[in-house]
Amino acid sequence: MPSFLVPSLVSSPVLLKLLFSPGPKTIWSLWQQPMLFQEATAFENMTKDWNYLEGSQKDCYRDTMLDSYENTVPQGSFLQLSMMPQRAGNDPPGVSNASEMEMEISNMREKFLMSVTKLVESKSYNSKVFSKEKYFQTIKEVKEAKEKGKKSSRDYRRAAKYDVISVQGTEKLIEATHGERDRIRYYVHKEELFDILHDTHLSIGHGGRTRMLKELQGKYGNVTKEVIVLYLTLCKQCHQKNPVPKRGLAPKPMTFKDIDSTCQVEILDMQSSADGEFKFILYYQDHSTKFIILRPLRTKQAHEVVSVLLDIFTILGTPSVLDSDSGVEFTNQVVHELNELWPDLKIVSGKYHPGQSQGSLEGASRDVKNMISTWMQSNHSCHWAKGLRFMQMVRNQAFDVSLQQSPFEAMFGYKAKFGLYSSNLPRETVATLQTEEELEIAEEQLENSLWIRQEERAEIGADRSDMDDDMDPTPEASEPSTSQGTSGLLCW
């Protein structure tokens, strides 16, 4: 087996990044990178194996290497509170000031653009990524191809692959819709890629390659696995975090019965980093969908917990079993008060799991504190109580492998929406909209543009059919007559 396919040797994102970069790769260049000596030695061996491969073999192995990389940036990577440096002044731990964050993002953007440029220039990479010049040149060629009276084969290929739409005076290159006006996939040039990847990465809680690809492939036609990996190699927060085992709060799936209607309730202790009067967090998880709810608590008294649970139950519905690792006495008291306050509700306590409780509670606490740290740093705030709802949304919209969908989809039956940024309108158009009237105008322009493209496509299809008929060498006299039966029919 080639050395670069051994999982232990592809654990460093630096190795993958250098292998994907064109040009000579010497051991000297590695000392420019933050890697260990063992990694540098591994890279030298990997490079030797890599150079022996043909171009087609490299393409074949590339996907395998990218799959191995999935473990390098774990899904939902979050920086642990304990790993954040202490800062001087009034900034809380883990909260960078705005100027430092802007400088870091600027450096990331510059490095990403350089890496993408090298990737595109690599002869072994069949690029879907446009330079800015190529992007606008393609728009021009697509428009010219549609306007030509007599079209070449290249014109037909262009028209079959791309469409151009105009919204508020801005022309955008999109994937040919073929009549599917409810699904638009945009093409972007490399100068636009970083902001799209960065915003998506943050919005899904520093999610890995698979989650980012799931988020982006529905709206963009040329955001590839390779460019996502290049971006992820630059995210310091993801690589500073030590991979931790996934916690298993939810029991193993069983055939459906009432016991499946279970919720998990934990009280997480935040007294060491209290946010004003809030010193605890209520962690709620639905067993079957893994949907979570986070709420700040002033105390861990049962009556305060019950008040929050009633809000949850009257919105999402009530489970049959309430499970908790916060103690049998606490669980029984909460269940008793729920049944007292809501006589029509009948809910029972979950089974006690000796030996498992502490690990499960610690897992939930670690997960939430990691999310809090990331949110505090991104928002320059130490008021974690205000951010719990946003952290909850990030976790619930993340793709879950065991569910094969996000917890939000499992709970509600559709994907989470974020206002107009979930619409088919271009991002830059959405950013300028202020009123419903402006939204209606933009949607009408998009609709009209799609209708025009659909009519043009129908005309091009008719022209292509006519051209095929003109090129048909079969004489008209040889066409079979229907009166001669089926024996004279020709098969095409």
From Swiss-Prot:
Residues 247-415 form the Integrase catalytic domain. Residues 479-492 have a biased composition (Polar residues). Residues 455-492 are annotated as: Disordered. Residues 455-465 have a biased composition (Basic and acidic residues). Transmembrane segments: none annotated. The modification Phosphoserine is found at residue 115. One of its GO terms (biological process) is regulation of DNA-templated transcription. Keywords: Coiled coil, Phosphoprotein. Pfam families: KRAB (PF01352). SUPFAM superfamilies: KRAB domain (Kruppel-associated box) (SSF109640), Ribonuclease H-like (SSF53098). The modification Phosphothreonine is found at residue 117. The keyword ATP-binding does not apply. Residues 36-117 form the KRAB domain. GO terms for molecular function: nucleic acid binding. Residues 427-457 form a coiled coil. It comes from the Eukaryota. This is KRAB-A domain-containing protein 2.
